[in-house]
């Protein structure tokens, strides 16, 4: 267990919350697509190159086993550690299974906002909020796995805040 509750207080009072539960399926399918060529390559290499060696069969067992473990375990762990929070002046994104990242984006730094949906997002009812900031390092901040309506709502909140800051 990671010790985090369903809602956790973030920076400046932001209530950190999980993204859509269906995002786990998006992650699972993306990992499956990533690992499938590696499994095929391992099977081919094992039969072609290792056929006459004592290591024959090792790649045919090890790589698919690792792929199954990654596809089964990683999506849940990534999901549990992906949170976002919103206050009246900032967006906070907390993520990281192996490497923890806590990103805080003040609305006044936002320059461009997008809501994107790929085929898997459409299939599972998720969207990604993309915030382009004025910074040079980490100038693009993403919040994947949001419900499409929630992503549009956050985009509109940030856009309205940007508009009022310049008036």
Task: Give the positions of each predicted feature.
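N-terminal basic, Ser/Thr-rich segments that initiate or prime the first beta/alpha elements at protein or domain
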Residues: 1-108, 112-167
């Amino acid at each position: 267990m990671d010790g985090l509750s369903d809602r956790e207080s973030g920076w400046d009072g932001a209530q950190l919350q999980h993204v859509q539960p269906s995002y786990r399926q998006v992650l699972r399918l993306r990992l499956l697509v990533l690992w499938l060529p590696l499994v095929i390559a391992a099977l081919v290499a094992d039969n072609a190159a290792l056929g006459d060696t004592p290591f024959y069969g090792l790649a045919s067992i090890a790589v698919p086993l690792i792929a199954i473990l990654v596809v089964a375990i990683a999506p849940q762990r990534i999901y549990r550690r992906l949170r976002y929070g919103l206050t009246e002046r900032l967006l906070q994104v907390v993520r990281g299974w192996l490497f923890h990242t806590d990103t805080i984006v003040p609305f006044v730094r936002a320059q461009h906002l997008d809501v994107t949906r790929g085929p898997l997002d459409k299939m599972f009812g998720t969207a990604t909020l993309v915030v382009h900031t004025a910074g040079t390092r980490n100038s693009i901040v993403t919040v994947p796995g949001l419900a499409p309506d929630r992503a549009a709502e956050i985009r509109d909140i940030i856009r309205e805040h940007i508009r009022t800051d310049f008036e």
